[in-house]
Amino acid sequence: MCALLSVWSQLLTWFAPNARHHRNATPRILVILLSEMGSVVLAKAMFDTLKAKHPGVDLHVLQLKKNQGVMRLLGFVPEANLHSLDDASLGSLLHDLWHTTRTLRALQLDGVMDCELFSRISALLSYACGARVRIGFTSHTQEGLYRGSFINAPVPYNTYQHISLQFVGLAKVMEAALTWSAAQLNDTTQRPLTRFLMPAIQQSLPQLPVDTAELHAFHARLQVDFASFMGNPKRVLLYVSGGALPIRAWPEDSYIALAKTLIANGCAVGVIGLPEDTPQAQRVLHAVNHPRCIGLTGYTRNLRELLMLFHNAELLVTNDGGPGHFASLTPIDVIAFFGPETGRLYGPISDRATVLESGMACSPCLTAYNHRDSFCDGDNQCLKVITVGEVEKLVLHKLQLT
């Protein structure tokens, strides 16, 4: 489909090079951020750049329906400008593809930014929405990542820059591309389009404001439901699950050993996660077998409550994934394990976060270039070699217990 659409796009370039596109007085831009919730947090600088460069910009966002909670909470765009695709079933996905595409085309967009690295579905959507300027990542001459040639402002993906900076790069290209003529958009001699200096990566994201009354109410609820946990001043949260990619998880036995050490040092431990993570959490609780080690999987009913839970703890120990990024919006300290992917590209943006990586020769092995297909097949030695003793020492230091 990408190849066919590329041929069609090229034919239009040849036979209708000066086709008119509606231009809005204030730019109307669509951002495609389908897949991971944590990426929304890392995209904050990109949204800030778009708003700074285009005052009054009419921003729209397309996401998977299940991932929209973060965008709603952060409020980067108005609720009415959030568009979704429901991938719960093939039928619902096809239904939303049809109706959402029609809605987006009716908006008469000036530009679209595809933040999905080398996803073909997002590339197709960027063309289908009808925007004149189409910005997305390109593999250039690298093989195996083909997704067509209809993205008329392609940006090279840089494996040496944090993804938040690469998102900013897309926004800076949009600033220039919106002023270009059709001939300039098709002028390949000007590429790569990212020949400009990048800002330094943010050291820390600003904390998300939380309503004081709401925070007090959640604190009181915790005190009623988990008195032994809340009665301890040294509260530590563990995210044991690997989420959609279990290969990113530090071993369960290591978490159990860490929890036992924390209990022995007088701390309280809460195991967090989604409701489907409960069986794994119960195994940890059973192994630790102490009243100060509690299960919190499924306890928070939404992302806002998860952030309030972070406000009620001192430290989060987590695998690579959403919780570490969400925690960067709160005062909690974070220790995050990376290995199959690297914190140099995807680490939390927080001066309170510490990334632990073993530095194994094959790490990272999950990349945009191999469609996140690892050699290890579940045997993530890069995480297994991170010792419990090493983590214990860091945790106790952060808790000021050493």
What are these regions (language model features)?
Residues 1-402:
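Catalytic machinery of carbohydrate-active enzymes
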